[in-house]
Amino acid sequence: MKRSRVIVVGAGPVGVVAALASAQKGFSVILLEAEPAVDESPRAATTHPATLEMIDRLGLIGQFIAEGLVARYFQFWDRPTSTRICEFDHDLLRDETKFPFVVQTEQHKLANMGIARLREYTDADVRFNARATAVCQDGNSVTVTVEGIDGGERISGDYLIGADGGRSTVRKALDIEFEGYTWPERCVVLTTLNDFQRIFDCCYRNYFADPHEWVNLFKVAGDDLKGRWRAVFPTRVDETDEKVLADDSVHARLQGVFPLPQPYEVAHRNLYKTHQRVAVKFRVGRIFLGGDAAHVNNPIGGLGLNCGIHDAMELVDTLHQVVTGQADDSLLDRYERRRRPINIEFVQQTTVGNKKRLEEKEPKVRQANLDELRVIAGDPQRHKQFLMRTSLLESVRKAESIL
């Protein structure tokens, strides 16, 4: 019996998870990536408990944890006074999940280990230098036009998953509006080999509230597993790209986190725009959007990639139910019914709230925000409730309740 074929556009972590999950469900899979290799620039790393459960289902959890850092705690700080406001402990979730912690594993590691596993399947094809330029469909199939090193071709399948990022070719080809807005400031990410835990009493994940310049500070393992720290700052609206990335600006920002007598050792610097946008549709016929192709958000809280992985797992489970006769095609609409409102409620609202909390300028409102965090952290019931939301466990359970 001929297997149903799933075409996945985009070999970032969401596309790779979608492709691997599809192969494991018995689909024929082709994964298309425009670039010559997985993008290994510093990007998302924070992986929440709800997502760890899914990576466990893929059979990758052991390697995933080994290549990252386990982060049980996260902290909020008042940057102007260098005061720790409170600490949250994921161990309070031990009765809710087998993974009561976050794992800091860079996203390219997940993509690479997923591709390695995918290549073990005889009916899975991974193609780099394969840029999707157009898509079309009829009642029985979907076809993607691909430009590669050796020219162009048309590839057909039963379903197509567009996981090709915020500038998604698939989304644009379907003329799907990307509702929302772009923040006026950008984010600059500075990676340093200096160990902040040796400098002051922080943990692996830290959020610094500051009316002038908030900071996210977190540790990742690095490819050599020796550890390095990333600091994320907002730019000033009037700063040019050249000014933001210049050595004097880079070192001034890092020295502003904690002054050192010598310059920081900077391993990488990156600058990007941030958005809050959600596609008005996640499905058109046999074509689906997931990950950044469907939704983008600011990085505070580390929710975007996690939600994208949830998209991929939800979608593949739904496709499998349909092709195996457990449900008819009408079930495919459930993917959008679940994933779009969940993203709006748990990712868009939360990341906007996180940003406003860190950047608040009005003194009374700012103090009230910090006091509220202390109260939540000090109350075991509210502490756990807060973690259920930040860990995305609550979002997964709510999604499952949507019929």
Language model features with spans:
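A conserved short coil-to-beta-strand element within the FAD-binding core of flavoproteins
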Residues: F128-V142
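Conserved mid-domain beta->alpha element of the FAD-binding
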Residues: G10-L20, G26-S28, G114, G162, ...
